Amino acid sequence: MFWITPRLGGWMVLAAVMLSGFAESRACIWDSDTLAMEQARFPGTLDVMGGNFPRHSSEFYMWRIERTHVLLAKEPRNLAMRDDLAVALHKLGRNLEAIQVMMESLAIEPKRYETLSNLGTFTIYTGDLPASRQWLQMALAINPNAHFGREKYQLWLVEHLMLRANPQSLPEITDGLQAGIVDQLRENYAEFVMFRQGKISGWMEEDSRGAALRGVLGMMLFADYRNPVLLEALGDILEQGNPLKNAVHMADQAYAFARDLYGENPVKERLNKKIKEANSNYLSKEAPDLKKLKNAMLAAQAAGEALAKRVREDELTWIASGQDAGAEFEKKYLGASMPTVQFRAAK
């Protein structure tokens, strides 16, 4: 995922996903307590899905571009400042310009993790998945445990998408595999993660699922919480595992969000199939828990919109008064009181 400079280090607090063990269960039932159990095990996940966390306005990124251009005129080799510029360009959809900034940084310092990681992210958005894979592999070779070990989940997501687009694209991974296994790897990100971890059948272990959630939720927080690819990947992780330890209600909503954001009918058919499979885990499609979840999601979305409006108003004020909008944002919105996204033990 793209590198956040030290001045924005507070994001690491917001994006932390804590792990703990899960009690073993022997039965498989769903009742009115299911949603409460899911929310207890995955507190904060609905807020991420609904966008209820502090995020910058487009005006902030325009300000940052102007500001870093001025500062870089004085310090053209300041790589951290170049990261700020590139990420701001990326956030405004100017990915080719962001890539150019990082290529210039690469010429200054060829083996810098942050530069390679940024390139791995930006090239995803230009559709060049093979290049993204190469950049991410280079970044991981320098720092295998970057972002608390989350970087590899972005690499695996890129590989999963490459296989989905073309099942022959990664022969070094798929050679010798049965066609049915390759199809599973193409259709479900959680299955691909398990395979890359050396497991080709059964449920995803809880520690593995928690680590994968760290990766996907981190990408949603840092990059784009409304990205349908990330939402589908989140649904795959939430739905996987022991039926009494997964979160099929939340998976249902993640899949539904992804389906609505995708534009192509074949993709929608795949998401409808995943929603149907998630639905099969509870007693009725009209289960009270699902209705409660949808209401909770609407509340998270409304809170997120209100928060985004407040942040934008503050940032416009800071910019107009000549203040450092980045520093002011961090002081006001990324303090120790910010809630974390956690992954707790089942009761």
Enumerate the predicted regions with their spans.
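N-terminal leader/linker segments that initiate helical-solenoid repeat arrays
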Residues: S25-N78
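Helix-turn-helix repeat elements of alpha-solenoid scaffolds
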Residues: F53-E66, H90-I99, G202-R214
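Short coil turns that delineate tetratricopeptide repeat
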Residues: P76, P110, P144-A146, Y225, ...
